[in-house]
């Protein structure tokens, strides 16, 4: 760290700690904000502060929300009988961009008893008939799917997962919209 530029390098390190931002990009961002556009830096800082204060998890489905219950859960035009299970709230926005799904969502970041109980309550409350698993294809996640299917076997639910248009081991955030759209359209029963 250069003496006299500690604050600048702290900013570089902060940017570098973000996903997909390397040293060069972090340097460019920090330099731009400090030397070219102070207003941009202030706006980013204010926006981050507001987001951290106001965004939380939906108490029903686990999606991101600025309210106790998210817009997806409150939207009466969505199909209550179809549920898409994802492993991250950010996956919901990726699926929404595909414009191929109009049901409800449920986020299971970690499969534990609390998450399973919440899922069962959500399924019962919404009278779910179909569950679509939109999770990263892998052997571990296939076991995850089978476990949930087993726990819900007493209910009359059809299970499917997005088709293998999504490469095995690739996170949904790294899949292009066309591939994701085709994968959702080609979902397979399990």
Model-derived features: positions:
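Short cysteine-rich clusters marking metal-coordination/redox-active sites
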Residues: 58-61, 70-73
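Long C-terminal interaction/binding lobes of large macromolecular proteins
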Residues: 120-190
């Amino acid at each position: 760290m250069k003496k006299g530029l500690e604050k600048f390098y702290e900013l570089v390190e902060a940017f570098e700690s973000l996903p997909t931002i390397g040293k060069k990009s972090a340097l460019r961002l920090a330099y731009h904000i400090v030397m070219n556009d102070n207003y941009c830096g202030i706006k980013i800082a204010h926006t981050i502060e507001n987001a951290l204060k106001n965004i939380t998890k939906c108490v029903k489905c686990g999606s991101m929300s600025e309210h106790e219950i998210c817009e997806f859960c409150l939207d009466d035009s969505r199909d209550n009988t179809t549920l898409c299970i994802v492993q991250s709230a950010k996956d919901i926005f990726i699926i929404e961009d595909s414009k191929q799904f109009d049901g409800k969502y449920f986020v299971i970041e970690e499969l534990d008893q609390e998450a399973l109980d919440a899922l069962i309550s959500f399924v019962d409350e919404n009278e779910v008939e179909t569950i679509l698993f939109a999770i990263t294809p892998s052997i571990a996640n296939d076991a995850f799917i089978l476990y949930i299917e087993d726990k819900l076997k007493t209910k009359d639910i059809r299970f499917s997962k997005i088709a293998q248009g999504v490469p095995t081991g690739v996170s949904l955030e790294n899949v292009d919209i066309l591939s994701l759209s085709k994968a959702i359209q080609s979902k397979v029963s399990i």
